[in-house]
């Protein structure tokens, strides 16, 4: 069938109209405001990086300037500003589809996905940009992407030209010891962590596979998690500009931000199970228990504290309290003329490495029963609990006829004092517990007592303490460490 000229013209007109409609529709789906906001145009494939702004103070910030600086470089740049709750005063953010505010705290009237930051990120890469940074040079994010792809590090970073630019650090995180240790980076600019202001870029899948991807302070939480996984960060020879109107410009604003930042950091470290931070130069920061708080663990069942089931050892703050209590108690006993010696697991720790066993939760000392009357605190404890001038609590233990010295009224980390007396050349006592090492022994192990380093001081110990320990625990006990109740949890089987 042949087409007439009229039919051919009609078909051509319909085809042309369809092409025009398709083109108009395509234009409508392009980013608005391609009104010469900046010198660069979006690549044909679209942006590969989402700018994520998390670290800022709601009461004083330069977030609008930060966001605008990235949009100047690329009007289609995806930007997510993340906050726990709606910032107040409100942020003056542009009302365009590629700039979004993510509220991370769950709310009754919002779906679960709304509080998950990954909901807002559709790009392969994420750039964590701190408040006070500004994008002035074109192509910085793309250069960071290329550096990440070309190198072996899982993160790359570019310092921000503020008063506190990023510096490279080594970081070792030991969950078992509840400790983070910072030091000089031996292979800078390849680092374990950064201290200071930097834009950090990584793959979105890596960021959102972390257990707390946007916990604040972002720098602290991010690098604790990445260093634990062995992910390096490469500090690049690129620099982001500082804000033209920097945040926290007044002394009051800086004071408020520092105060809230310290509280936020302490809460984060406690939540992540870090009780001690060690810095280069020997400075220590403690985030665990003290005399005014309770200890870090609850009642011990079956001689196996809860932290052992978590594949952790005694928190360092608890070990510090035990060392302090042991040193103090030994000083009181020596001043009063009470003969004492390291007992049980405490003697075992001293024999192994001169300290408390890393998973132990108390200190044991034996004393001569006949010397109890020499010590004012022990005499007082016979009648009831005594709090001395240093805040230590001396009391008779409820479990039996022995004494206990607690770190404080709040914190019940303690030293147990076991009164022994000689009978026919054998040391015995009136209270026995269901422990293998709780047995009688010949008095000749105490004649004489010998000095032995323990927990930062020198304590008295039985002579021939190896034989003494093997009598109580069995052969090879010094060389073969084991948890206190292997039937419940074995050191070799705990992972």
Curated annotation (Swiss-Prot):
What mutagenesis or variant effect is reported for residue 455 to D? Answer: In MDDGB5; severe form; brain involvement; intellectual disability and cerebellar cysts on cranial MRI
UniProt-reported outcome of changing residue 316 to R = In MDDGB5 and MDDGC5
The post-translation modification note in this UniProt entry reads:
N-glycosylated.
Which subcellular locations apply to this protein? Golgi apparatus membrane; Secreted; Cell membrane, Sarcolemma; Rough endoplasmic reticulum
Q: Entry's InterPro entries?
A: FKRP_N (IPR055105), LicD/FKTN/FKRP_NTP_transf (IPR007074), LicD_transferase (IPR052613)
Enumerate the residues binding Mg(2+). Answer: 360, 362, 364
Per its record, how is this protein called by name?
Answer: Ribitol 5-phosphate transferase FKRP
Species of origin reads Homo sapiens
Q: Which gene encodes it?
A: FKRP
């Amino acid at each position: 069938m042949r087409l007439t000229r009229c039919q051919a013209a009609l078909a051509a007109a319909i085809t042309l109209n369809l092409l025009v409609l398709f083109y108009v529709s395509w234009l409508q789906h392009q980013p608005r405001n391609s009104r010469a906001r900046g010198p660069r145009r979006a690549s044909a494939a679209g942006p590969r990086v989402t700018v994520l702004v998390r670290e800022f103070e709601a009461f004083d910030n330069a977030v609008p300037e930060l966001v605008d600086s990235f949009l100047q470089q690329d009007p289609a740049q995806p930007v997510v500003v993340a906050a726990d709750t709606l910032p107040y005063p409100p942020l003056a953010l542009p009302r365009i589809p590629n700039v979004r505010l993510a509220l991370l705290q769950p709310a009754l009237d919002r779906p679960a996905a709304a509080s998950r930051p990954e909901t807002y990120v559709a790009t392969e890469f994420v750039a964590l940009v701190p408040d006070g940074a500004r994008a002035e040079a074109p192509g910085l994010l793309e250069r960071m992407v290329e550096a990440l792809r070309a190198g072996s590090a899982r993160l790359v970073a570019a310092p921000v030209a503020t008063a506190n630019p990023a510096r490279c650090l080594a970081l070792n995180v030991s969950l078992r010891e509840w400790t983070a240790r910072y030091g000089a980076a031996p292979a800078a600019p390849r680092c374990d962590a950064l201290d200071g202001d930097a834009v950090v870029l990584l793959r979105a899948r890596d960021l959102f596979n972390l257990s707390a991807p946007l916990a604040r302070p972002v720098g602290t939480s991010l690098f604790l998690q990445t260093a634990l996984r062995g992910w390096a960060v490469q500090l690049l020879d690129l620099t982001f500009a500082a804000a033209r109107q920097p945040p926290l410009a007044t002394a009051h604003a800086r004071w408020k931000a520092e105060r809230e930042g310290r509280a936020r950091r302490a809460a984060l470290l406690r939540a992540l199970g870090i009780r001690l931070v060690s810095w280069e130069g020997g400075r220590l920061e403690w985030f665990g228990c003290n005399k005014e708080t309770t200890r870090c663990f609850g009642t011990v069942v079956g001689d196996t504290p809860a932290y052992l089931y978590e594949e952790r050892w005694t928190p360092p703050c608890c070990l510090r309290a035990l060392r302090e209590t042991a040193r103090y108690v030994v000083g009181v006993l020596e001043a009063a003329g009470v003969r004492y010696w390291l007992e049980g697991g405490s003697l075992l720790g001293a024999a192994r490495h001169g300290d408390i066993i890393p998973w132990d939760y108390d200190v044991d000392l034996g004393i001569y029963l006949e010397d109890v009357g020499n010590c004012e605190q022990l005499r007082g404890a016979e009648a009831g609990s005594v709090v001395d001038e240093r805040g230590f609590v001396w009391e008779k233990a409820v479990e039996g006829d022995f004494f206990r010295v607690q770190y404080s009224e709040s914190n019940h980390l303690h030293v147990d004092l076991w009164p022994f007396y000689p009978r026919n050349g054998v040391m015995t006592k009136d209270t026995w517990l269901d422990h293998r090492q709780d047995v009688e022994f010949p008095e000749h192990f105490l004649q004489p007592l010998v000095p032995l380093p323990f927990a930062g001081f020198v304590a008295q110990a039985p002579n021939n303490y190896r034989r003494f320990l093997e009598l109580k625990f069995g052969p090879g006990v010094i060389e073969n460490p084991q948890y206190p109740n292997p039937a419940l949890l074995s050191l070799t089987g705990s992972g």
